[in-house]
């Protein structure tokens, strides 16, 4: 039976034992990758500066997912929030990684067992002795078990009843920590940025899954529906499973890219929309204005801005600035952030405060334009000096820093003023170390961007897979010439193979 390479998976089509085996082996590979990747990331992760060099700047991918579920400590003696730990306990980052690797090994052995012992009695019909699977019953069992897991996660892990809780932070990603979360049963639970919705939705969805599972275990599908949806065909299971997976992938791509309580900015980095909308800039100005209203000086007001908040307001942390094929972490792009230089305030010779127009997300270069409080252009860095009217030299622009390392320092030299005006296009100004990692100065995306791109791409691919396999099972008689009501099953690898002349096409 010469199967082409793209149809080799049909060998498990009517072999439940080996179908289970290959799925267990797949689980072993996934769990093994997760544990190994976690150990690799822990080997290269630098926990020394959680403010200016957080996990998402270092390109960590699996550490943020462990952290949002309540893991914060390492056997190396450090905590993700900074400081040292004396007793991290079993469920540290390394402990979780090790558990995944051990689970992977057990799955590997189980896969081998099921491959060798494939012809089990449980796969045979008691009445006829022929191979058969009660797929609606199996669906009910799986739905019930997944409902129990979903309910347990929401009712115990997230709420802290039996578990650590989840990562919760303020709207500006400054005070994040792992804590128990109470379910939000009101309308606020539908706000994607309310952590309580995670608990309540898992409890509700889990309850629904348990009830639906019990329903499918106790109620048989009508014959017309069973035949119409080909419920006796394992490819129907494949098609509907792919549908569930691609739907979930589309959903999480959205919650990651647009932001939600499940994707905190402290763990995955800010979203592009927070730059586009000046989200952090507005909060910084609000805090400064409040300080000035309390009779603080500019220097005092700006010095009270958390460095963490200022760092979010920097275009280099925008996940949409990274090119699609630029490999590496953000630190490999613009460098490792060392310190905030402070907020530059530009003034012309008449004393007007000027604001540098910020670079939009999808621009690589952008003209340096300084406007006043009314939006009128007062200064720029001209492309052609011969025709300039608003150059820094002509307008007499100066810059003074408030807060940060250059607090109180002012410059009137045009070359220096223009240098900081160019850098102010990119948000708050930071000193960046490019030497340590040989950073090339080209922006990279954060794990938020990678996750979104990967899941959106695979969701699209799996959508077509759902259409393909759904069509194959619904129109099997048209595509393969096989009677859709044919329920005869023979040994694995020798039945229902397109292109195989030995496949029976009609029931006797």
Swiss-Prot record:
The keyword Electron transport does not apply. One of its GO terms (cellular component) is chloroplast thylakoid membrane. The chain crosses the membrane at residues 21-36, 101-115, 140-156, 203-218, 237-252, 457-472. It is found in: Plastid, Chloroplast thylakoid membrane. GO terms for molecular function: chlorophyll binding; electron transporter, transferring electrons within the cyclic electron transport pathway of photosynthesis activity. Keywords: Chlorophyll, Chloroplast, Chromophore, Membrane, Photosynthesis, Photosystem II, Plastid, Thylakoid, Transmembrane, Transmembrane helix. Its main location: plastid. SUPFAM superfamilies: Photosystem II antenna protein-like. GO terms for biological process: photosynthetic electron transport in photosystem II. It is a multi-pass membrane protein. PSII is composed of 1 copy each of membrane proteins PsbA, PsbB, PsbC, PsbD, PsbE, PsbF, PsbH, PsbI, PsbJ, PsbK, PsbL, PsbM, PsbT, PsbX, PsbY, PsbZ, Psb30/Ycf12, at least 3 peripheral proteins of the oxygen-evolving complex and a large number of cofactors. It forms dimeric complexes. NCBIfam families: PS_II_CP47. This is Photosystem II CP47 reaction center protein. The gene is psbB.
